[in-house]
């Protein structure tokens, strides 16, 4: 979006973890406020109108109707954690939060490189986004323990990874499916 530039492109203005988005993973988007490839965004426009806050949570009007309406459906990533993730970044500090996101991205990259049958990118991105870091580590440890799978067919490896991720999601009481816009 013209004139909208941010220093932190890995974690968006509104609380989306750009670093875990399939569009950024695929190289199609530079992240929130990252320049060329950035999509037009009503929340970015609002930030510019409000003086260019780095995060919505810094705005005096937060949370506003524009912010809340954005959660009606997911885009390429789940929107359900935006407010909680903004609060977490504020609580532990942006650098610590970004370090956690980068660790999740490392796991996501490993899943995509070694445990993918070219049909799991959305699932893996949603899992990296929604599951806690420790849950993702448990999945990777369980996959590493299945040495017979390591050299197996991609489809079997992907099925094993997907099953472990789904089990962790069920344990946490969350769904790894994106919420589509109704109507």
Model-assigned labels for residue ranges:
Residues 24, 39, 50, 100-103, ...:
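Residue-identity detector for glutamine
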Residues 1-57, 61:
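N-terminal cysteine/histidine-rich coordination modules
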Residues 161-168, 172, 183:
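Long non-globular sequence segments
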Residues 57-159, 176-183:
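Short loop/turn segments that flank or connect secondary-structure elements
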């Amino acid at each position: 979006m013209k004139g909208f530039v941010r220093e932190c492109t890995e974690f968006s203005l509104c609380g989306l973890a750009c670093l875990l988005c399939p569009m950024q993973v695929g190289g199609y988007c530079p992240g929130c406020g990252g320049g060329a490839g950035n999509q037009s965004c009503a929340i970015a426009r609002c930030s510019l109108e409000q003086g260019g806050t780095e995060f919505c949570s810094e705005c005096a009007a937060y949370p506003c109707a524009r912010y809340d309406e954005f959660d009606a459906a997911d885009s390429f990533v789940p929107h359900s954690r935006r407010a909680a993730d903004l609060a977490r970044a504020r609580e532990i500090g942006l650098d610590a939060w970004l370090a956690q996101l980068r660790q999740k991205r490392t796991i996501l990259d490993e899943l995509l490189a070694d445990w993918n049958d070219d049909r799991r990118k959305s699932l893996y991105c949603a899992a990296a986004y929604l599951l806690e870091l420790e849950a993702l580590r448990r999945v990777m440890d369980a996959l590493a323990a299945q040495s017979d799978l390591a050299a197996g067919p991609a489809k079997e490896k992907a099925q094993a990874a997907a099953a472990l991720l789904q089990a962790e999601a069920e344990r946490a009481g969350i769904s790894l499916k994106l919420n589509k816009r109704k109507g």
